[in-house]
């Protein structure tokens, strides 16, 4: 897991063309917001959305929410102008769509020299090149684009996301190998709370830092699922205490609840506590 000073349990897409949605986002319980200029904006609204979002980011206070701008691709008529407009914007990262190889990030890096870059992982080629992409020195985050990936694969939706497992796993491996944040794809049925919870739990258990969301109604479940539970925090504290006590007696392992606790378990326990502390700090900010 990447060491984060900021949680990414809930990452909400907001269309850059919708002024009311941009205003409402100030009060939402999202850890991060993706201000979208790409898929969520119609072609005839692209230029308006760019201007509206630029002004909004300059004038609206989103508190400590992590602000990500998803631009249009460099192969479109809007991509370069998007990057030029937001190169020095009040954003925390620029999200590049449909990254298929590390070279896709080079032109963007030149136009946006100061902001961190995130990559949308949503093509078959991107899955196969995930390690190369994750190694790019400017990249700090990955976002799974499961809708576009499903379209490219020609796969049908199943609750276990069987067709997605290979791609999700490759991107997770790449992100963890290079210390990146990585968030899972969206769940389209925003009124299906049971289905959303199950998919959030699957993503959490796989190792994702959080989930991208398409509707504010999904925030509560994502935040809950991707937060360490009181039981997990209590266990982490007991594991650390038992291991430190064992070390004081010259032992390299401890036993907690009938299970061996080694150094690798302590690393995980400390990560659990660090995540809980980051969430608490974010809530208090």
Curated annotation (Swiss-Prot):
Any one GO molecular function term: magnesium ion binding
Alphabetical keyword list: Hydrolase, Magnesium, Metal-binding
Residues noted as binding Mg(2+) in the record, renumbered to the chain: 122, 148
Cofactor(s) it depends on: Mg(2+)
Statement: the UniProt record of this protein carries the keyword Hydrolase: yes
Gene Ontology biological-process annotations: oxaloacetate metabolic process
EC number(s) on file: 3.1.2.30
Substrates-to-products reaction catalysed: (S)-malyl-CoA + H2O = (S)-malate + CoA + H(+)
A Pfam family this chain is assigned to: HpcH_HpaI
Gene3D superfamilies named among the record's database cross-references: Phosphoenolpyruvate-binding domains
Membrane-spanning intervals of the chain: none
Amino-acid positions noted as binding substrate in the UniProt annotation, renumbered to this chain: 70, 122
Subunit description: Homodimer or homotrimer.
Function: Catalyzes the hydrolysis of (3S)-malyl-CoA to (3S)-malate and free CoA. Inactive towards beta-methylmalyl-CoA and other CoA esters.
Family: Belongs to the HpcH/HpaI aldolase family.
Name of the protein in its database record: (3S)-malyl-CoA thioesterase
Taxonomic source organism: Cereibacter sphaeroides (strain ATCC 17029 / ATH 2.4.9)
């Amino acid at each position: 897991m990447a060491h984060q000073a900021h949680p990414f349990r809930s990452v909400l897409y907001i269309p850059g063309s919708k002024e009311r949605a941009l205003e409402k986002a100030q009060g939402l319980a999202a850890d991060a917001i993706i201000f979208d200029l790409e898929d969520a904006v119609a072609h005839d609204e692209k230029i308006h959305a760019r201007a509206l979002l630029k002004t909004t980011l300059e004038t609206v206070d989103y508190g400590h929410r992590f602000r990500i701008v998803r631009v249009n691709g460099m192969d479109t008529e809007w991509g370069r102008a998007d990057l030029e407009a937001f190169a020095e914007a009040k954003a925390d990262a620029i999200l590049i769509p449909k990254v298929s190889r590390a070279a896709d990030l080079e032109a963007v890096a030149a136009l946006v020299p100061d902001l961190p870059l995130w990559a949308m992982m949503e093509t078959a080629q991107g899955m196969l090149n995930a390690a190369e992409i994750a190694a790019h020195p400017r990249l700090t985050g990955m976002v799974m684009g499961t809708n576009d990936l499903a379209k490219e694969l020609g796969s049908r939706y199943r609750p276990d996301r069987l067709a997605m497992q290979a791609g999700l796993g490759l991107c997770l491996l790449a992100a963890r190998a290079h210390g990146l944040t990585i968030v899972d794809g969206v769940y389209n049925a925003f009124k299906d709370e049971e289905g959303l919870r199950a998919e959030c739990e699957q993503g959490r258990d796989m190792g994702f830092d959080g989930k991208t969301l398409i509707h504010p109604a999904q925030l509560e479940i994502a935040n809950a699922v991707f937060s360490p539970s009181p039981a997990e925090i209590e266990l982490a504290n007991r594991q650390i205490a038992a291991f430190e006590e064992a070390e004081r007696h010259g032992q390299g392992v401890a036993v907690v609840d009938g299970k061996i606790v080694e150094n690798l378990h302590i690393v995980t326990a400390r990560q659990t506590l660090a995540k809980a502390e980051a969430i608490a700090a974010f809530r208090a900010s």
